[in-house]
Amino acid sequence: VIPARRAVVLGLVQGPAELLPVSSSAHIVLVPWLAGWDWEGVDPEVRKSFEVALHTGAAAALLIGQRHLIAEELRAFDLRGAVVLALSFLPAAVVGYKFERPIERHLGGPRATAYGLLAGAAAMLVADTRPQLRGRGEAGAADGLALGVAQAAALAPGVSRNGITLAAARWRRFSRDQANLLSRTIALPIIVGATALKGTRLARRGASPELRRSVAIGVAASFASTLASQRLIKLVERDRALWPYAAYRAALAAAVLARLRRGD
């Protein structure tokens, strides 16, 4: 069972980490480890379900906070957009459904998470050197597939769905503001799908009242912290390079690997 106070802490961390390309999943893995919590003692299925629930709380906050932008995007939605959305969803859905549990078992620890942070940082640095030639309404099937592969890669903790999809869009030569818009647009189907899958699995095995309470507290904290952190989106949306976020990720990964080497 996840204690209520820890559920609150992780929910509060989720909001800012969700809105910046720094990997919220890495922070949900590393905060308990750095704080010395017995996080490894929690059932992996429960840990992942809790993490997905935090994403759901953040997504709900974004739906409210960004409702005007979402409404504008829906009005402009067409067949081409539907193809991009479908292709961006399918690779991650298939990989997640087939390999989610092995990923949780083998890539859910601090070391693998640190490597994920480094890999995502490298991808962001390389992609952000690409020219900004493409803008609104220019995304096609190949772009959707590239974003889908990126979202599948983001199933590994530390890679960051936000960061790697920004990198994929920038690699496809989209402008920074359009890359941000694409990254946010394709997020919702993945979050809804993951919530449905985890919710179904958790319902089948049964969830104790204590676990349901912890999940509800975490979701509420994630919702509140995301809603309060909406202005962080502006930091990424401005015409700025991704290197500050890549540098933060690399520094965090280095700190984790150094601590692991010391055996702390």
Name every feature range the model reports, one short phrase each.
Residues 1-264:
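Multi-pass membrane proteins that catalyze or facilitate reactions on polyprenyl-/lipid-phosphate substrates
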